[in-house]
Amino acid sequence: LVNQHLCGSHLVEALYLVCGERGFFYTPKAGIVEQCCNSICSLYQLETYCN
């Protein structure tokens, strides 16, 4: 799960794993797709989308 392309349902699943009970907010304008699907993101970057 470290430093890889995450798109669609894979991205959502990764957010559930990283954020756990905190949950997360998904706003396309935040650039998570550009950051994690079009390029590669880290667990630390994913965690910035947690609540």
Swiss-Prot record:
Its main location: secreted. Insulin decreases blood glucose concentration. It increases cell permeability to monosaccharides, amino acids and fatty acids. It accelerates glycolysis, the pentose phosphate cycle, and glycogen synthesis in liver. One of its GO terms (biological process) is glucose homeostasis. Keywords: Carbohydrate metabolism, Disulfide bond, Glucose metabolism, Hormone, Secreted. One of its GO terms (molecular function) is hormone activity. Belongs to the insulin family. It comes from Didelphis virginiana (North American opossum). This is Insulin. Heterodimer of a B chain and an A chain linked by two disulfide bonds. Disulfide bonds join 7-37, 19-50, 36-41. SUPFAM superfamilies: Insulin-like. GO terms for cellular component: extracellular space. It is found in: Secreted.
